[in-house]
Amino acid sequence: MLKEESNESGTWARACDTCRSAACTVYCEADSAYLCTTCDARVHAANRVASRHERVRVCQSCESAPAAFLCKADAASLCTACDAEIHSANPLARRHQRVPILPLSANSCSSMAPSETDADNDEDDREVASWLLPNPGKNIGNQNNGFLFGVEYLDLVDYSSSMDNQFEDNQYTHYQRSFGGDGVVPLQVEESTSHLQQSQQNFQLGINYGFSSGAHYNNNSLKDLNHSASVSSMDISVVPESTASDITVQHPRTTKETIDQLSGPPTQVVQQLTPMEREARVLRYREKKKTRKFDKTIRYASRKAYAEIRPRIKGRFAKRIETEAEAEEIFSTSLMSETGYGIVPSF
C-alpha cells in the first residue's frame, strides 16, 4: 500500500480498491469503489454503461471520503466532516464560500489519465530549451524569489498557455492558490513527476529577471508564472490568527455626500418648447383668463335668508341678550313718559 502525504492527524491516504497500489482520486457511487486515475479510466472505458457512471472527487484533506463541497477560497474539495471541522476553526474561515460538488463526467475523468502525447510534448520542450538557452548553468547561483527564468530567450506567452492547460483545464490537478493568507485547509498535493519537474527545470535557467533589456511582456503571463511557482512551492497554507487585523479593505467606503446625491430626488429635465408650442400655450392661457368668473356664488340659501332677518346693531349682528336688554330699556322709557312721574321723588 502506498502512503501519501499525511495531514496533521497523521492519517493514511485511502488506496485504490482495484490495484491496491496507488492512492484513490475519485469515488464511483454506482460501483461503491474508490479508484485511482488509471483504474478509473480503464474500468469506465470498458462499455457504454460503465462510462455513464457518476464519479466524485475524493476529499483533499482526509483522502478517505468522497468530496461534497468545493471551497473557493482554498480551492479544495472537502467531504462533509472535513468541511465542518475546518470552516469552524475561526471567524475568517466561516466566511469562506462553499458550493456543492456536481458529479464528474467521463471526459473530465479520462483527461486525468497519462498519455503518450504529453510525454512527447515534454521531450520537445526540453529539446527546444536546450537549443534556445546557451549555457544554462552559468547563473545558477543568482536566485530571485526562489526561481529564475530568462526574459531574453523564454517565450512567456507560449509557456503561460501550456501552464494554463495544465492547471486550469484539468479538474483533477491539485493546486493551491495564493489568496493573501486566506487558506486554512491543509491540502495533500500530488506532484506530477513529468510537468512539475519540467517546470522547475525551466524556472532555474540562471538568467537574471529584469526589464532593463527593453522587452515588453504581457502582465497576464507574469501572473501565470507566479501562480505556477506558488503551486510547486506551497503544499499547505494556514491562516495565522494575527493576520486577520492586517487585512486591508480594497473598496473604500462611500461618502455621505455621494449617498445623499444618489438617494435624492431625480433632477427634472427642462423641456425645450418650439415657438409654435409656446404661442399655442399663451393663447390657451388668454382664453381661460377671459372666461374667468369673479362674482360670488351663494352656496347656502338658508343662511342668506336668515342673515337678512337677523337683528343688527350698528350694522353688525346682535346677540339675543343685547336685543332683549335694549327692548326693555326702550319700553321702560316710554312708560315713564306716559305716567308723568319718575321713580325718585324730587323735593
UniProtKB/Swiss-Prot annotation:
Zn(2+) 1 binds at C16, C19, C39, H44. Pfam families: CCT, zf-B_box. One of its GO terms (cellular component) is nucleus. Zn(2+) 2 binds at C59, C62, C82, H87. A zinc finger (B box-type) spans 16-58, 59-101. One of its GO terms (biological process) is chloroplast organization. It is found in: Nucleus. GO terms for molecular function: DNA binding; DNA-binding transcription factor activity; zinc ion binding. Putative transcription factor. Does not affect flowering time. This is Zinc finger protein CONSTANS-LIKE 2. The gene is COL2.
